Amino acid sequence: MTIQTVTDAIRYVGVDDNTLALFENQYPVQPMGVSYNSYVILDEKIAVMDSVDARAAEEWLSNVAQVLEGRNPDYLVVTHMEPDHSGSLMRLAQKYPEMKIVGNAKTFTLIKQFFGTGALSEDRMLEVGERDTLSLGLHRLRFLLAPMVHWPEVMAAYEEEEKILFSADAFGRFGSLERTARAPWAPQARRYYYNIVGKYGAQVQALLKKISALEIKTICPLHGPILTEDLGEYLRLYDLWSQWKPEEPEGILIVHASIHGNTAYASEALKSKLEGKGAQVTMCDLTATDLSYAVTSAFYCGKLVLACSTYDGGLFPPMKEFLEHLQTKGFRNRRVGLIENGSWAPAAARLMRTKLEEMKDVHLYETVVSLRGALNQTSEAQMDALVAELCAE
């Protein structure tokens, strides 16, 4: 990735990764890729803001050296210790032995865990706490602890002179800068938020409260583009997402897990009936869609219909895994309808209900559509009743 000028004194030195298949070894990021963002603040003293994944170390070190133009960095500020951001930390520390590492107490605990207790001498560790500052000359960083957004050591850094928020993983987005330069921010930022950060909405709210008093002109996250325009919209979405509120309160998502096609056919029939009533409906086939997209869509809409076949007396595995992911990510504040299928002993509705009742503020529609194979007159009447409930609000 080409070095970018953020301001006269601040450079982007991050690296695009267009070969990674799975982010965190579970979320598909092809063909869009992902970026590992890092920045350099050039002043009387020089601060490097975070490192990158070890797989991108060589390009990153070259970028940093090019920006330094023979100078040595004074500080490496570590806002997040997850390996995609700390994987090259020790490479820079070894290259510049006089450079101090800036972090909070939990940062240094994790450095010792990842790199060994003797990786850094005590005199190279500069520990900061809430609202502590670090002067670089004209520029000054103020630190805001953001525990569990989404790791315990996370902190943001606010550069007071140019009013830049270095936000760690907050406001991040899937997609390399090269491949997604013209892509809208929200779709992959939404997917990133709900699957990576989403469980920790309360902690995100705490960070949003801290930064609400700041004048922010630029947000520099650790993944995705630097944000400079319409910051109010990014903040609005993060506020909405972190309260688990739907972006489309009346939107209906039908999620189906069908073995031989009858449950999928019933889902299509439901979609057609709802659209005939003017409803906004989206479909998701769990047997053909990555869970990260299904989870994101479930949070986007205010209403959800789950259609699942019974399998070995339990839930068809794609639906079981989907519900487990929803619960892990804090799914709440939604209304849910159920469609089950079981040729001789349908149990899916009961099992889905049990799982949903463990979630906060999830309200189930009264009508359950119960299939015994294919949709018939009886189950279609149930479907009509469910349509009436879904469209009554």
Predicted segments with their positions:
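Zn-dependent metallo-beta-lactamase
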Residues: 1-45
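Active-site neighborhood of phospho(di)ester-bond hydrolases with catalytic His/Asp-centered motifs
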Residues: 49-51, 73-81, 100-104, 165-169, ...
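FMN-binding flavodoxin-like domain, especially the glycine-rich phosphate-binding loop
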Residues: 177-219, 223-226, 269-282, 294-393
